[in-house]
């Protein structure tokens, strides 16, 4: 205060202090309003990622449901191969990814999304099918999960060892599992092409260019093709889980929580962090 003035007035420093205090209060109120909107999902952003298969067929209905429920949250979808997805998840560029590859449990939290099974897909024109009639499955059988029935027989891969195969390249979960399956079966296959995407191998099988190993997720998501015959594989590596991943010790935003709850209904009943 300036005691020499009449009436008593604030000094310039005092006036500056009051103005600064008012600005701080305004910022606090603005931040509280922003946090309130974040908690109510009236604002914010969420970045999710997956391989081409999951980005094309698994994420869209979840994203559509989320956007309808929370239209003010900006949701980004990134598509890429597993190493790139993990790189972006680690860097914080993605909040959540979906993948069937087991990531480092010391770095990432995971929640089980679904189970999928590997199948042998063979062009119907291949002669080897004649030796395996009782093991054959159609796409409609896969869609009603007949291959998951313990009483349905699995085929011996040796029946197809002389056929051409299209295969995924190394450093891929499907390829690693197939290598383990073939190793246990004691057979080597004739790989005519090596590719990067599971869907690409499937499409080449559709064109009769080679047999392939595909997930039942692919068969369930795509239109039925009578030119492909499917076979059940009896091996532990033929069954795998698909997970939602996010970085360990990362703050779980309300948008992340709600997205995970929509993707995995009922998860909040088993974990308090999603309540």
Task: Please identify what each model-predicted range represents.
Residues 13, 17-20, 62, 177-178, ...:
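Short amphipathic alpha-helical coupling segments at ligand-binding clamshell hinges
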Residues 17-39, 270-273:
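Alpha-helical linker/hinge and terminal dimerization helices associated
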Residues 81-85, 90-94, 100, 171-227:
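Hydrophobic hinge/microswitch elements
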């Amino acid at each position: 205060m300036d005691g020499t003035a009449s009436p008593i007035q604030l000094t310039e420093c005092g006036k500056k202090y009051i103005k600064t205090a008012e600005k701080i209060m305004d910022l606090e109120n603005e931040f509280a309003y922003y946090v309130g909107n974040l908690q109510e999902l009236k604002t914010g952003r969420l970045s999710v990622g997956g391989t081409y298969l999951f980005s094309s067929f698994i994420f869209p209905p979840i994203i559509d449901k989320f956007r309808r429920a929370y239209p003010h949250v900006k949701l980004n979808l990134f598509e890429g191969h597993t190493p790139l997805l993990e790189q972006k998840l680690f860097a914080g560029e993605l909040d959540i990814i979906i993948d069937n590859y087991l990531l480092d449990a010391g770095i990432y939290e995971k929640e089980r999304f679904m189970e999928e099974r590997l199948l042998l897909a063979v062009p119907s024109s291949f002669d080897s099918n004649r030796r395996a009639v009782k093991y054959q499955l159609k796409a409609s059988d896969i869609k009603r999960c007949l291959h998951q029935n313990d009483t349905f027989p699995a085929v011996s891969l040796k029946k197809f060892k002389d056929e051409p195969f299209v295969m995924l390249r190394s450093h891929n979960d499907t390829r690693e599992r197939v290598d383990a399956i073939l190793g246990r079966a004691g057979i080597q296959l004739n790989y005519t092409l090596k590719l990067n995407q599971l869907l690409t191998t499937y499409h080449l099988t559709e064109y009769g260019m080679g047999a392939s190993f595909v997930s039942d997720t692919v068969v369930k998501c795509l239109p039925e093709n009578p030119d492909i015959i499917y076979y059940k594989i009896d091996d532990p590596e033929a069954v795998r889980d698909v997970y939602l991943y996010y970085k360990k010790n990362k703050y779980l935003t309300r948008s992340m929580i709600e997205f995970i709850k929509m993707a995995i209904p009922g998860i909040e009943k088993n974990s308090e962090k999603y309540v």
